[in-house]
């Protein structure tokens, strides 16, 4: 009887939350924003008037493999398997800078059309499987060129640049980046015929994967860059949401959070609060890798940190930013000393529980993307964090359970919305 009572109480709470959320969705609908594009409305994602949860995965490699037609089957397999497990969002790169391999941008403004066609294929296949895509526009790191490559291009044109951090301030470098943004956003897909900026398959643009600027820990340099580039993106594309690509480290705007929440030594020139308050930034992101940030700590300490890290960001997204929060990267490596699949499952379970509880209460957390999804035959891409569904049954079960719970919430909100009378219409003039 106690369990039954608890179940009834939970349903009552959910019903109350549904009423509150549906009221907000009526306001969202009044503002427009259908047509298959996901919008940020308050602290929620909304798709055609209903709450939308970004339940998904990272697969940075999608464009790189799709650039080779003989490898496209792996892209299709990954998207198909993801959809089969209830995943709805993929995050991937729309960059690869420099002259090596399947680079996208060979030099400033000079693009490899075969690689661009690979990205066309990714978006076409994602649409086929009902998966939305977040496209990141440049990397902080140099594995795929990133800001170091941009700086080197500027040096080759005679710019006297000292540090790679001048990526954020040098006018020539910023011009290169703005040109790349415009090229990607205005690209017309050779398969679908739809310009990227008009394609609802794209969930959002990301300014940079994990921006950092250790030469200016005040955060002012990155803040200025975000402000300029957010305005640039929005001047080209008003259809899609935009996010920064932040890991979530707190900065000067919230000094108490630096000591209480940031892992020790992780103040890297970004500011979770200030950066996400920039006009044009539609939602906040956070990444979390306790096994890297707290290496040497035991599993319980890492799980405890994960809980505190997420709680702080969820609370701040709700009360301070008043914007949606996406947990855009999280994972645990099998290369960690003493690793067991149970440890990974516990970490995934912690993340998913935080997402579900926030979503169930109508809170700011709109989903999570694990790092990373692979399919068989991709051994060279294994980094320790990979999930291959057929090889990891327990973790796959955790992922699938989360998909099922979020799908239940989506359906509950959708049913409640359908049961609501049309806003602004009387009883007798709403049709049959």
From Swiss-Prot:
One of its GO terms (cellular component) is extracellular region. It catalyses: Random hydrolysis of (1->4)-beta-D-mannosidic linkages in mannans, galactomannans and glucomannans. It comes from the Eukaryota. Its EC number is 3.2.1.78. PROSITE patterns: GLYCOSYL_HYDROL_F5. GO terms for molecular function: mannan endo-1,4-beta-mannosidase activity. The keyword Zinc does not apply. This is Mannan endo-1,4-beta-mannosidase 1. Ubiquitous. The active site is at residues 210, 329. Residues 1-28 form the signal peptide. It comes from Oryza sativa subsp. japonica (Rice). Keywords: Glycosidase, Hydrolase, Secreted, Signal. Its main location: secreted. It holds the Pfam family Cellulase. Substrate binds at residues 93, 209, 289, 371. Belongs to the glycosyl hydrolase 5 (cellulase A) family. InterPro entries: Glyco_hydro_5, Glyco_hydro_5_CS, Glycoside_hydrolase_SF, MAN-like. It is found in: Secreted.
